[in-house]
């Protein structure tokens, strides 16, 4: 009998009895999020909790989706924003896909710097022309819900952790009268010239900033709100507007729009916040997200991270990961096998992602605010990828979550202008990526396994209605003729 056969048998036994087993101590030590970050793995090394709404992770370059008006194939390497072979970091953004073959997100990039203020990211070949920094993997740590790296050009140590809806930054600065924290509202993954529809920034006081970013990308109509709180008051702040000159500019010219503004709005903004720091001084940032409102983001922050204890948030996140990973235990003397297995399990528990505020509110496909009554609302359903194995696995080790995911899919059906179950949904949008009809397999599998607290009659009606949608993927022609005369699939 081969080692693989023995391992498979052990895993099968663990599936059958995980509820009775005690947690194996220290399974998080085997998680290596850096796995998959090279070439086309499309994973990210940053901090997130299981199925978290925040994925706080570094970006290593600014590769545009377009080049000379055409698709730039180099962008495909940056689906998750990070490439292991790169030598610079442009900053740390709060939203990422994991393992996808297309991309979006990369919202609200934060970058600490020291010295002369630079608001352009620069290039990989000339990093000192902008705010990016060189880094070395020798000074990088990537673990479950924790990321750490030294920004060599600034002698700043950057640390990240996260709760479900809040990214927690901790930056250790050198002594300087010119310390800055940049908030780049223009940066994004799969970026292009007109992707930003609008951005807004409200400086509430010298420690709190709120705002939003609206984009037109893979999700065509997406608005994400934020609240950003500093542990130390900034002494000055400002921004630079990179938008094209507007025909209509209003009467904002009576105010200073580059410094000491209470609010500013434009398509393309980069803001900065200035500090004086002592050697080894830590500046912390809590960065909360909301699909609903700026107030929702602030409430999420107050609910999940009321204090400033970075280590406590990190420990809570790693405890949550430990609980999830302990649902399957394996027995092997091979460290590599443990790392591969538990990192794969970790990656399996990143998506779908929670998509609602702490008060259960979320924005639906109809652009109205809804309340998830009795379930947790999820998004990021790459169903053509996940119906075969991931959701069947969830029925075994995450039955409550999978049940909630199907309730989220049924809510999607109710709110969809097309009255269809999701094809590939993210950020409260249907992006229509890939062909097929995979929602029904996820629903049917849950029903057959007895994991269906939702209305099976409603689910059946949603499945039938979606299957009979005449204007989707040639279904009308198939219903009329029994075949499709020509394929015109818009994958």
Predicted region positions:
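Bacterial Sec-dependent N-terminal signal peptides
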Residues: 1-22
């Amino acid at each position: 009998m081969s080692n693989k056969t023995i391992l498979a048998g052990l895993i099968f036994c663990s599936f059958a009895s995980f509820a009775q087993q005690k947690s194996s101590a220290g399974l998080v030590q085997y998680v290596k999020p850096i796995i998959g970050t090279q070439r086309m793995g499309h994973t990210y090394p940053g901090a997130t909790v299981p199925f978290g709404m925040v994925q706080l992770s570094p970006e290593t370059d600014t590769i545009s989706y377009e080049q000379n008006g055409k698709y730039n194939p180099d962008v495909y390497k940056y689906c998750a924003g990070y490439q292991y072979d790169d030598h610079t970091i442009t900053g740390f953004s709060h939203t990422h896909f994991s393992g996808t073959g297309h991309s979006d997100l990369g919202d609200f990039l934060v970058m600490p710097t020291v010295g002369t203020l630079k608001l352009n990211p620069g290039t990989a070949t000339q990093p000192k022309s902008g705010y990016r920094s060189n880094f070395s993997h020798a000074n990088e740590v990537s673990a479950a819900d924790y990321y750490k790296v030294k920004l060599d050009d600034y002698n700043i140590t950057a640390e990240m952790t996260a709760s479900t809806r809040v990214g927690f930054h901790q930056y250790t600065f050198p002594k300087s009268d010119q310390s800055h924290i940049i908030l780049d509202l223009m940066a994004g993954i799969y970026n292009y010239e007109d992707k930003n529809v609008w951005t807004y920034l409200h400086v509430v006081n010298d420690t709190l900033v709120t705002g939003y970013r609206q984009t037109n990308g893979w999700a065509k109509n997406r608005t994400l709100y934020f609240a950003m709180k500093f542990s130390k008051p900034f002494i000055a702040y400002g921004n630079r507007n990179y938008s094209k000159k507007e025909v209509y500019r209003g009467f904002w010219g009576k105010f200073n729009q580059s410094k000491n503004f209470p609010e500013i709005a434009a398509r393309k903004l980069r803001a900065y916040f200035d500090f004086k720091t002592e050697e080894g001084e830590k500046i912390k940032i809590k960065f909360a997200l909301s699909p609903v409102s700026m107030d929702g983001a602030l409430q999420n922050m107050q609910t999940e991270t009321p204090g400033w204890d970075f280590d406590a948030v990190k420990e809570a996140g790693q405890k949550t990961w430990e609980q999830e990973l302990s649902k399957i235990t394996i027995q092997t003397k091979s460290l590599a096998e443990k790392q591969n297995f538990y990192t794969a399990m970790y990656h399996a528990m990143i998506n779908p992602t929670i998509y609602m505020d702490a008060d259960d509110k979320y924005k639906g496909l109809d652009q109205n605010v809804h309340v998830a009554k009795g379930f947790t609302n999820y998004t990021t359903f790459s169903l053509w990828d996940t119906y075969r194995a991931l959701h069947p696995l969830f029925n075994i080790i995450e039955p409550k979550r999978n049940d909630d995911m199907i309730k989220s899919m049924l809510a999607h059906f109710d709110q969809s202008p097309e009255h269809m179950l999701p094809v590939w949904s993210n950020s409260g949008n249907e992006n229509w990526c890939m062909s097929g009809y995979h929602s029904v397999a996820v629903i049917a599998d849950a029903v057959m396994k007895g994991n269906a607290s939702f209305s099976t009659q409603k689910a059946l009606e949603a499945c039938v209605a979606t299957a009979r949608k005449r204007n989707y993927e040639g279904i009308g022609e198939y219903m009329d003729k029994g075949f499709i005369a020509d394929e015109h699939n818009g994958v």
